[in-house]
């Protein structure tokens, strides 16, 4: 690492990140109080951005023990292009649709002052295929459910009415990506008309739920967004060998099945293969895909310049774009497995594009793409390249073959050193060819620009080529070691600097603006949120409004986010980073002067007020240099160190969400229909009388059952009569007729009441209507000579009539005889003498007793 780079990193860490919440929108500042930085119009890797809004990202860690690969006589360095793939841990996501019918039975108590819900019972049922067709095309369903349980068939109808076709309408939901369509969103809880009675109301709701489902490799099960689990592979079609642990008769596949979007009802979409699964309480369907729709590998990075160091037992792929060294356990490449064929097209396309960019300096000859698996579980796609300068010398050497010397001019024997050098070169070439993962490059066709094959310069060219190759490989080894050592030191420095400001360090590593934060011993890296560059303005004043002693230590910035018209305020950080806070303040100092860099400019503030703007070149730059250390180091094959395995990390979590949801769904299916909401019943006890009466009838056996049936029959008959009367009253003709009859009865009652009142007030006039006229004639003397009888005679007549009436009543009672109750009472008196009332028929005894009683008083 150069001193210039270390110094720049230290300068970048001068401002500590203050991670606070986002501010509320502010009013734009007047133009006279702001200055527009030219960095908003420049193309830079560090635009104005906000890095405090990102909450998560990719996890990285710095290696604590990095050692560089060694270079020796047995090593071979090769340049090339490298693509790195990792396991795809992102689950396979696909759309699913759930169909269900929810039957809700509510027991309503009609109280004197208020109505109460004393019980609620809810059951869910799956939907048959003939009804799912209607729900998927015209969004209609039947509002009834027919089910058979324990040999008893029951039919539930919405609103306790008749089975009709109803429409499904969109409803709201809480989960993201979930859309529901329901036929009945309101529960039927109307109480009965009779007070102090219970009434059961039924609600049937057809529900469609569109959501997402996820499944991880090896696809033994998948989970929906709402937590429903299915113990099968989403790629199972009934014929392949995918995982299937559901009931065999619950799954079927339909071809050319059509699903219409709710907004596009009436259209004819393209058919698809769709799987249907009956879970008992709901039905699931999803588009059936092949396993090839999911790629088990994910592209991580592509390195344009990579050095492959072959050590005899392993290959080290060292890149110049980061402190990365990929080690393989073998020196022979493999063919791409069939399970990973999904990346072949991407690899070929990327390698072709990268090679076209460097083909003026490198050639690949007939080299093919080779694949390696690292000890850390990564898949490497490797394309070796050869510099064109070395390829020319190599072709000349291969085209030139030694020939026997003519007798006239025998060639002198080679010295021992030369022979050793030549044999060593051949040995290294053979070892290199045996260690290469790719097929050896065949000799190229002879060119027309070369001389004869017995060229005396052949040995010299061969020696020159071997020496050149040895020197180039040694130089590449020295460069690789020096570069690796520098990266090792930089790794240690950066690891310590991330404890101070991880955002600045990771931004310098990536070469672009990123957000980073430490999570214990690892670093989370995520993208920053760019702002609208055209709206960024700097405040000219750094003084805190309303305070004479406090000033801002960093200038204020006004900005707006992209696609947002609201203006926000923050403070300018290092490398155009904007902090969503105005907490960086200090006590105002006299004659202060600050320099703040923004793009290619530096803003100068004197006495906390913008003074001028100068060019970045106006400030001198410190130059540092680190000498290259070419000392040899031994080769070390690093093993992949994993502090905690994936299974251990899963086991360390208290909440196993997969296990919880799977167990919950298993238990929920077993107890479906048995759940009751008894909170109101327990607190108020309004149905205890009904439960107690039911237990009493059950204890009586057949007698209690007969009584219950009799009461139910009578109650049902009475309820039917009342319901019929209410239905007849609701009819227009019946209601009018009943109103007319009620009006007639009211008029009749009023007439009889008046007649009775007249009878009680003037009984003689009611019995003899002409008595008033006769009295008037008698008073005027015009009528016949009729004189009224005396009052004594009238009373005698009335007394005679009364006695006659009483005598007729006694005669009727004697003729009727004693009643049953009287005879029973008389029999009891005869059996129990103590109950008899004593009668004293003897006058003397009665007189004696009366005398004794008078004496006592």
Swiss-Prot record:
Residues 398-452, 832-857 are annotated as: Disordered. Glycans are attached at residues 76, 163, 290, 329, 348, 395, 436, 563, 629. Residues 678-730, 709-729 are annotated as: Hydrophobic membrane proximal region. It is found in: Virion membrane; Host cell membrane; Host endosome membrane; Host Golgi apparatus membrane. The record marks 432-433 as: Cleavage. Residues 108-114, 192-200 are annotated as: Involved in fusion and/or binding to host membrane. Residues 404-416 have a biased composition (Pro residues). Belongs to the herpesviridae glycoprotein B family. This is Envelope glycoprotein B. It comes from Epstein-Barr virus (strain GD1). The gene is gB.
